[in-house]
Amino acid sequence: MSFMVSEEVTVKEGGPRMIVTGYSSGMVECRWYDGYGVKREAFHETELVPGEGSRPAE
């Protein structure tokens, strides 16, 4: 599944709601606020699922 920039996602195993900020070669860059600052990390697209605020499936 590919994600679009600005889409909301979460890690399949659970975790914070994150916003997609980039996508390249199957890796999805996400950012989120952890209560102290903005965090950034890249995940393989298979590790993520669409969040509540995501676009409907086509």
Predicted features and spans:
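Basic/aromatic-rich interaction segments and small domains that mediate binding to polyanionic partners
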Residues: 4, 8-52, 57-58
